[in-house]
Amino acid sequence: MSGSINKDPRDVIIAPVVSEKSYGLIDEGKYTFLVDPRSNKSEIKQAVERIFNVDVASVNTLNRSGKRRRTRFGWGQRKSTKRAIVTLKDGTIDIFGGPLA
């Protein structure tokens, strides 16, 4: 647990997920981020609270395995990722930089 205190929050949160589904969840106060696969829920919660100055109610995580793809040289695989869906107690995060439509 002491390692998570010294970890830089920008090493935990990689990028916001830009998709129709994640954009629709913003109305419910849920934000989706790509996160470091080695990070846990408490590290993700601390990172979001530090970066965006908001209170986090809960964090749900999911591991997505990379798709198997055919290449010229045989079979390859896309990178596996970890996503976190963060629910806020109150407040908003301006991650897309504009007003919601």
Swiss-Prot record:
| Endpoints of the signal sequence | none
Q: Which Gene3D superfamilies match?
A: 3.30.70.330
MF term (GO), any: rRNA binding
Q: What keywords are annotated for this sequence in UniProt?
A: Ribonucleoprotein, Ribosomal protein, RNA-binding, rRNA-binding
* GO cellular component assignments: ribonucleoprotein complex; ribosome
Q: Is rRNA-binding tagged as a keyword? A: yes
What single Pfam family name could you report for this chain, choosing any that match? Ribosomal_L23
Gene Ontology BP annotations: translation
Keyword Ribosomal protein in annotation = yes
Top-rank taxon: Bacteria
Spell out the subunit comment.
Answer: Part of the 50S ribosomal subunit. Contacts protein L29, and trigger factor when it is bound to the ribosome.
Family to which the UniProt record says this protein belongs: Belongs to the universal ribosomal protein uL23 family.
Against HAMAP family, the record matches this protein to: Ribosomal_uL23_B
Question: What exactly does this protein do?
Answer: One of the early assembly proteins it binds 23S rRNA. One of the proteins that surrounds the polypeptide exit tunnel on the outside of the ribosome. Forms the main docking site for trigger factor binding to the ribosome.
Recorded hits in NCBIfam families, A to Z, give: PRK05738.2-4 (NF004363), PRK05738.2-5 (NF004364)
Which PANTHER family does the entry mention? 60S RIBOSOMAL PROTEIN L23A
**What protein does this entry describe?**
Large ribosomal subunit protein uL23
Q: Organism classification, top ranks? A: Bacteria, Bacillati, Actinomycetota, Actinomycetes, Micrococcales
The gene it comes from is rplW
